[in-house]
Curated annotation (Swiss-Prot):
It comes from Haemophilus influenzae (strain ATCC 51907 / DSM 11121 / KW20 / Rd). It catalyses: L-aspartate = fumarate + NH4(+). Belongs to the class-II fumarase/aspartase family. Aspartase subfamily. GO terms for cellular component: cytosol. This is Aspartate ammonia-lyase. The active site is at S323 (proton acceptor). It comes from the Bacteria. The gene is aspA. Disulfide bonds: none annotated. L-aspartate binds at T106, S145, T146, N147, T192, S324, K329. Homotetramer. Keywords: Lyase. InterPro entries: ApsA (IPR004708), Aspartate_Ammonia-Lyase (IPR051546), Fumarase/histidase_N (IPR024083), Fumarase_C_C (IPR018951), Fumarate_lyase_CS (IPR020557), Fumarate_lyase_fam (IPR000362), Fumarate_lyase_N (IPR022761), L-Aspartase-like (IPR008948). Residues 322-331 are annotated as: SS loop.
Length: 475
């Protein structure tokens, strides 16, 4: 049974409340928990965000202590508390407010101030809640507003999360690249508009998947760099209200040291405090990755379709029974789930777009939902890349005979004859093949367009795999 002795008294603008004695958070967080019961997903469920906010508090304490904005012993205690959170993970579970919240992120900033203050108090031998010694607002939040601390912590967190995503995209890329080498000498039919086109190798197809992911890595790295231009030092609206002389440059310098990232002050702090354009760009890059990854999964599902009435060029690992009514049915469940992840990311991009547009005048209060969308997109894309490699791509095999049969029974190979019989004759050959069911070789020989030796040369496997090879006809 909980008794009143297990609580401490805290006071804010609205009055006095009982706060659990063991909680590192305080009255402002308590009110946020009561006010925003939306998703059952809390800030503690996004630990990278907590770390980003704590890094901001460490950088500001260093700058404030150096400039004399707060006493040096208090600055040291705050820094020590931040270091403990960052190095050990202590208090990461002390952020119970919902990820959906009003107030432009004030609840997250208040929560961070309270946790850091109470941990700092313990480190110097005081009890939680003794705010006359170290105060969440006057000391931890010194020279700050939610409007610069929150977006800066958010940007650092998103940037670091994207680095983890990039690592997993590279992990998936390596699997496709390995398969490209494994399947380098397996001939297959390329298709455009779902119709037979011209031959290629399975290796070339998988290499294209790998290169596609390389492009996304480059694009994400380039775009994520926008997040490192921060508005720390702007305080409420960008004018730097209540900051000491030289604070902005110094605090961003400390932030770069704390994070290990190339953080720079925004060119114009008023613009940076009101604008969310970087989020639109960064999530747009996430959407682009999702669009491309979903297309790859579409291809994997199509190429593995069958087993008797589909393409059946490749085999995906069999992971679970696919039907409650149809015996022996196995479905491409991993590409399917990755498709769904990608759809969610694409939807989140719309959320980020609308929320970024919804600011008024000197502030956009919708950053919490931008944060929720961005962290969710990054998290599920990261997991999807790992899942796709581990449960699908690594185990893909090719049905070589089926692939080659499609090539040699296809009308598409008539394209290789264009330089020798002309496009018009190629059309005629293709039309006869379609009408009669005969093969290209058979019709060309019947029409006397080429000799059997010439056809052997032109339609050799070597020539089909390397279409710039001119064969003996051009020697």
């Amino acid at each position: 049974m909980i008794t009143m002795t297990q609580f401490r008294k805290e006071v804010d603008l609205l009055g006095e409340r009982d706060v659990p004695a063991e909680a590192y958070w305080g009255i402002h967080t308590l009110r946020a928990v009561e006010n925003f019961n939306i998703s059952n997903v809390t800030i503690s469920d996004v630990p990278e965000f907590v770390r980003g906010m704590v890094m901001v508090k460490k950088a500001t304490a260093l700058a404030n202590g150096e400039l004399g904005a707060i006493p040096s012993d208090i600055a040291k205690a705050i820094v020590a508390a931040c270091d403990e959170i960052l190095t050990t993970g202590k208090c990461l579970d002390q952020f119970p407010s919902d990820v959906y919240q009003g107030g432009a992120g004030t609840s997250v900033n208040m929560n961070t101030n309270e946790v850091v203050a109470n941990l700092a108090l313990e480190k110097i031998g005081h009890k939680k809640g003794e705010y006359n010694v170290i105060n969440p607002m006057d000391h931890v939040n010194a020279s700050q507003s939610t409007n610069d601390a929150y977006p800066t912590g958010f940007r650092i967190a998103v940037y670091n999360s994207i680095l983890k995503l990039i690592d997993k995209i590279q992990y998936l890329h390596d699997s496709f690249d390995n398969k490209a080498k494994e399947f380098a000498n397996i001939l297959k039919m390329g298709r455009t508009q779902l119709q037979d086109a011209v031959p290629m190798t399975v290796g070339q197809e998988f290499k294209a998947f790998a290169v596609l992911l390389e492009e996304e890595v480059r694009n994400l790295k380039r775009t994520a760099g926008l997040l490192l231009e921060v508005n720390l030092g702007a305080t409420a609206i960008g004018t730097g209200l209540n900051t000491p002389q030289g604070y902005t440059e110094l605090v961003v310098k400390h932030l770069a040291e704390v994070t290990g990232l190339a953080c720079v002050p925004a060119e114009n702090l008023i613009e940076a405090t009101s604008d969310c354009g970087a989020y639109v760009m960064v999530h747009g890059a996430l959407k682009r990755t999702a669009v491309k990854l979903s297309k790859v999964c579409n291809d994997l599902r199509l190429l593995s379709s069958g087993p008797r009435a589909g393409l059946k060029e490749i085999n995906l690992p069999e992971l679970q029974a696919g039907s409650s009514i149809m015996p022996a049915k196995v479905n491409p469940v991993v590409p399917e789930v990755v498709n769904q992840v990608c759809f969610k990311v694409i939807g989140n991009d719309t959320t980020v777009t609308f929320a970024s547009e919804a600011g008024q005048l000197q502030l956009n209060v919708m950053e919490p939902v931008i944060g929720q969308a961005m962290f969710e997109s990054i998290d599920i894309l990261t997991n999807a890349c790992v899942n796709l490699r581990d449960k699908c791509v690594d185990g893909i095999t090719v049905n070589k005979e089926i692939c080659e049969n499609y090539v040699f029974n296809s009308i598409g190979i008539v394209t290789y004859l264009n330089p020798f019989i002309g496009h018009h004759n190629g059309d005629l050959v293709g039309k006869i093949c379609a009408q009669t069911g005969k093969g290209v070789r058979e019709v060309v020989l019947e029409k006397g367009l080429l000799t059997e030796e010439q056809l052997d040369d032109i339609l050799s496997v070597e020539n089909l795999m390397n279409p710039t090879y001119k064969a003996k006809l051009n020697k």
